[in-house]
Regions:
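Conserved HGGG/HGGXW glycine-rich cap/lid loop of the alpha/beta-hydrolase fold
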Residues: 1-46, 63
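The feature captures the conserved acid-bearing segment of alpha/beta-hydrolase catalytic domains
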Residues: 188-199
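Active-site loop/oxyanion-hole signature of alpha/beta-hydrolase fold enzymes
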Residues: 35-78
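Conserved alpha/beta-hydrolase catalytic His-Asp/Glu region
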Residues: 133-185, 194
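Conserved hydrolase catalytic core segment
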Residues: 69-112
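Acidic beta-to-alpha connecting loop that harbors the catalytic carboxylate
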Residues: 208-210
Length: 210
């Protein structure tokens, strides 16, 4: 389609364009759907700053590259944080928002509580691993790989160890992006008092098991 849709992935330093492609790719019959590896993730350069402001600026550069005055912004999980940040920074450029499994504030405590509730199913999930992920104190990329391998079953409705192992092997990890996101960005992330400023249509979806 002629209208532009930009989809932003979650999990800085872990996820990639493949995630929003799965979530939003079916809209390609109505939109030009663009997904990408955000700065510090996937095959994009692992060069900071890894701030919300920079990620918003990167989205705007993509919008400009496609020559769109306005577009539909989509994001899942942490990508939803950035979608909201973009909509508030550039309200005149957003036609609508699609938010998947996300929040307008730091939900770390809720995520940790939910993870601990299922930890008995997966013994590799320890308090130390959850603390390091959500406090942004991962040591290096090998440590990030080990931490994600422990919590990866939480991302599947039905855990498939072989599929999980393949996914981890194919992932390009960047612990610095994760650490900055959780140790710095999320400490001040709370947009609840500004949500009333968003005047475009918003579709909010959430998975029953998310």
């Amino acid at each position: 389609g002629d209208r532009l849709f930009i989809g932003h992935h979650g999990a800085p330093g872990l996820s990639s364009h493949a995630e929003p492609k799965r979530a939003f790719g079916k809209l390609a019959d109505r939109f030009t759907v663009v997904t990408f590896d955000a700065r510090g993730s996937g095959e994009s350069d692992h060069v900071g700053p890894y701030t919300h402001e920079q990620w918003v600026a990167d989205i705007d550069a993509i919008r400009e590259r496609f020559g769109a005055e306005r577009f539909v912004m989509g994001g899942g999980s942490y990508g939803g944080f950035i979608a909201l940040e973009y909509a508030l920074a550039h309200p005149e450029r957003v036609e609508a928002l699609v938010l998947r499994d996300t929040a307008a504030r730091n939900y770390g405590e809720v995520a940790i509580r939910n993870a601990k509730a299922r930890a008995h199913e997966f013994p590799a999930i320890t308090d130390d691993i959850l603390e390091r992920i959500f406090s942004g104190t991962i040591i290096d990329n090998d440590d990030y790989r080990r931490c994600f391998a422990a919590i990866a079953p939480l991302y599947d409705v039905k855990h498939d160890p072989e599929a999980t192992a393949k996914r981890i092997a194919a992932t390009r990890f960047n612990y610095e992006s994760n650490n900055y996101a959780f140790a710095v960005n999320l400490k001040s992330y709370d947009l609840r008092d500004r949500l009333h400023e968003i005047g475009v249509p918003v579709l909010i979806t959430v998975g029953r098991h998310d």
